């Protein structure tokens, strides 16, 4: 009740939504998160489906199809493909922009940002700036799971630490890219971990 009261006092009772299409460009991933039912990477060969890595033309086709169906945004995410570089991510954004100058591109988790900038040997700021210049509009705050390192050590030990994740999000804001933030719960966390995540 208190949370709703704060929300109403801050934002009123208006509710909005976005018509969005999620485009997963690859399910090939070098990470091995314990909870993932999506990845076709290490230790995940038994999961349903085959590995895929879709082409730029397919990303464009799906974007154009989304626009025809009334979407105003595409969200792009995928596994951390071992052969992807930062240029791969930039080129995906450019491919979409070659097809539409108006669709909102909401793409790449902090984990993808970290992977991309490392492959190019540049800072997080520089990489995010290049993505924005290519046409990126905002970042999804995924790969957050629970922003508590005790939990992350159990469910995703090879992912970014809580502080690393937060620094990438803060840097995105400095570049002028708004972000969201997600929380995955119902696994090994307790309510103090959830509270800590929300406070961050």
Language-model segments: what does each one mean?
Residues 45-61, 81-98, 123:
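Active-site loop-helix segments enriched in His/Asp/Glu that coordinate
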